[in-house]
Amino acid sequence: HQLAIDPADIIKEYGEADLYLFRHAQRRCLYQEIAAVLEAKLDNEDLVKSQMEFYQRVGMPPYFGLYEMGCYIRKVNQVTIDFGLAWFEQVCKYSSRDQLSFPFVLWNFEDRLKVAILKGNCSKYIGTPFENEGNEYFTNHANHIK
């Protein structure tokens, strides 16, 4: 995806934030996503279960949020750099499914990181029981391929 509008317009609409995210189009919880990953056999079962058990053990709450990682906006500053490194560590240690580790790291950074939730979805082409209108902020690269 490619940004389709001036980032200043997004800041005007949502205010200053470190991350601008879309909610996940189908689920609202990390643990729901883990169940979906396990059911579809999208990653190593033992690894994903180990990740889930660790998150539960350290108190990761259910329904903290789940986000579409296909397109998001990140301000470049020290807190987002630290956030990105912590997220990368989780992806290296556990599942490479980025949506599994993102909410956990976000939870750990919630007192240092300001997040704005964008309206719509990352892609209007995803069939979902929730919102399905796409968004005005990004274009889909597939539309540009000839």
List where the protein language model places each region:
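GT-A fold catalytic core of metal-dependent nucleotide-sugar glycosyltransferases
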Residues: 1-34
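Catalytic core and acceptor-binding pocket of nucleotide-sugar-dependent glycosyltransferases
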Residues: 43-145
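Cell wall/extracellular polymer interaction/catalysis modules
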Residues: 21, 27-45, 123-128
